[in-house]
Amino acid sequence: RYRGFDGVVIACVNFEDPEVIELIESNLPVVTIDRVFPNRISIASDNKKGITDLVSYIIKKGHTKIAYIHGRDSAVTRQRLTGFREVMRQHDIVVPQEYIRETDYRDIQRTAIATAELLKLPDPPTCILFPDDYAAYGGINAIKAAGLRIPEDVSVAGYDGISLATKIEPKMTTIKQDTKTMGMLAAEKLIALIEKPSTTEITSVTVPGILLPGATVTSQ
């Protein structure tokens, strides 16, 4: 037991934090969300497929000049970057190095700066992918500050499918992570791990996201 708990679901934390690592390495039943550890059950969004579906949709809309502002290095970021590069390569689309920018997840200010830099390129992108829906608002503000319209002048897409993204106009093109299913699976796995530790399989479960076409990606 840990502070009176029989088990813990770990999500939305810094997985490099020493206290988190100590908990993961303890004897307590643990299930992690969106991070895989040896000998631990994990529930993760299928980030590679999610970004692949999103970029494929954008390409079908006629875009080839697609920039990607991604989050800091992590397993999630690496999966999404791999998916992005693979689908672009499958369509024989060369991605200029200056089209790839790094920022922090949920960082509106840094995302706005990265977006402004992309817009100032001699050959700017026609569509910009953001690390998440929240950070996307920084990019949207930068696009509007440049006197450009979404999606008429620049198309944009986010990731996560937060409720606000579906309520603003135009509605955000994004991938909705199935957090409800992920939470339910995490709870089910943790209960099984607590009640039947010797027979519960230690495995990693991936949950597909859902493409929300929205209205921020226009046809070229």
Where are these regions (language model features)?
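Alpha-helical recognition/docking segments in bacterial nutrient-uptake
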Residues: 1-56, 60, 119-120
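Conserved functional loop/turn residues at catalytic and ligand-binding sites
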Residues: 4, 27, 62, 92, ...
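Short acidic/polar active-site loop segments enriched in Thr and Asp
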Residues: 6, 63-65, 126
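Anion (oxyanion) recognition and catalysis
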Residues: 24, 89, 144
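Flexible loop/turn connectors
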Residues: 116-220
